[in-house]
Design a protein with these regions (language model features):
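The canonical Cys-X-X-Cys-His
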Residues: 51, 57-67, 139, 175, ...
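Electrostatic cytochrome c docking/interface patches
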Residues: 36-56, 68-70, 133
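Gly/Gly-Pro-rich "capping" loops immediately C-terminal to redox-active cysteine motifs
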Residues: 69-141, 155-168, 197-198
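C-terminal capping alpha-helices of c-type cytochrome domains
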Residues: 133-148, 161-190
Length: 198
């Protein structure tokens, strides 16, 4: 018997199978400690239900779900629920905004122009083009601090993060759980465009 295979009771030490099993058992703990998002099936149904209530009450669909004209007037296109500004909808330059007007919005209700530049609503679905790589902590920090994940750029108007940052931790966790539970939609909205130099 080789020195690295000494017997401890009846279990050989450093057996390759045991190494593999040990790594497989440790992987979930490592991923949780690294902040990897939970799978939708791991979500608490009561928390998801609460999150849906907050999302619907806070008006998230008003901007993050593209609007279309319906028989009874404009409304959210729920087939693209919370997927942000459609990547296929290329916006022309916005018309000039003159005082006392401050900002304008696109008919889709997903693109807005004002003194801050042009902002496009984010995909909030769990797709990789949306919040797929976000952790609960990333989401809460974005809402509390008004900073986009990754580049730390300020979240632009009209996103009312200054209002939403007053939600409780439990409510923000519930919103994130709900967003993790909805169908992923592949859609990469355009990036924010800073205002043109005068």
């Amino acid at each position: 018997m080789k020195p690295d295979q000494q017997v401890l009771g009846s279990i050989p030490r450093f057996n390759p199978i045991h190494k593999i099993l040990g790594m497989m058992l440790a992987l979930p703990l490592i991923l949780v400690s690294q902040g990897v998002p939970a799978a939708a099936g791991d979500l608490d149904p009561d928390r998801v239900k609460r999150g849906k209530y907050v999302v619907n009450s806070a008006g998230c669909h008003d901007c993050h779900t593209p609007w279309i004209m319906k028989d009874d007037g404009p409304g959210p296109d729920m087939s693209r629920m919370l997927s942000g500004h459609p990547e296929s909808l290329v916006m022309p330059p916005p018309p000039k905004v003159e005082a006392p007007w401050v900002w304008i919005g696109a008919g889709s209700n997903t693109a807005f122009a004002g003194p801050w530049g042009i902002s496009f609503t984010k995909n909030l679905t769990p797709d990789p083009t949306g919040l797929g790589s976000w952790t609960e902590e990333d989401f809460i920090n974005a809402i509390r601090l008004g900073k986009s994940k990754g580049n730390g750029r300020p979240i632009m108007p009209p996103m009312p993060w200054r209002v939403y940052r007053n939600l409780s931790d439990d409510d923000l966790k519930a919103v994130f759980a709900y967003l993790r539970s909805i169908p992923p939609i592949k859609n990469t909205p355009p990036s924010y465009q800073a205002p043109a130099a005068p």
